[in-house]
Amino acid sequence: MITRCYLEITNICNLDCLFCPKTAREKRSLTPQKFDLLTDKLRGKIKFLYFHLMGEPLLHRHLPEFIAMAREKGFIPVLTTNGTLLSRAQAVMDARPYKMQVSLHSHEGNGKENLQQYVYEAMRFAIEAAAKGVIMVLRLWNQGGYDKENERLLDMVAGYVPRPWTQCQNGWRLADKIFIEYGRMFEWPEGEKSENSDGGAF
């Protein structure tokens, strides 16, 4: 049984990470009307609705509206973000997605942002969102050479949520509803990487 669906609400991203497979498709964002239509078709067929594929969902100005609409239709909304726009994502937090996953390696993939400020914004958001009931997952790669900053990042995170942490299946539980998880870099299902496919969220 299929329990989740990845719905690409935009393929536009504000970063250019080395580990991202990227896309050559036309830059587009889902309209509220199209989102309503697609979620109506998915209603009753899947449980978890992931607002993620190639783009950065926090760039979409209708994201809080989409989260609210998804909840009203019985979906469990989950977001994955590069974390660089969290300082202006209060409306997203207030819309209360079930879970938000923040890729802490977006900094390493670009090498432009101030790392301390990046971690500060991620942790400030995570602590506040968790207090409102949102599960916050901070993601770290464990392969492909992008794990060299892991210990440094963990030490910086510990400055906001001190150790000891509780070890869990894929990483650590830092506090109530705040986790660090290790994972592999994204791979297309069944090796499908063709840009000639008609697939996509649009």
How would you describe each model-predicted region?
Residues R28-L30, Y50, K73-I76, D94-F202:
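Radical SAM enzyme [4Fe-4S]-AdoMet core and its adjacent flexible, acidic
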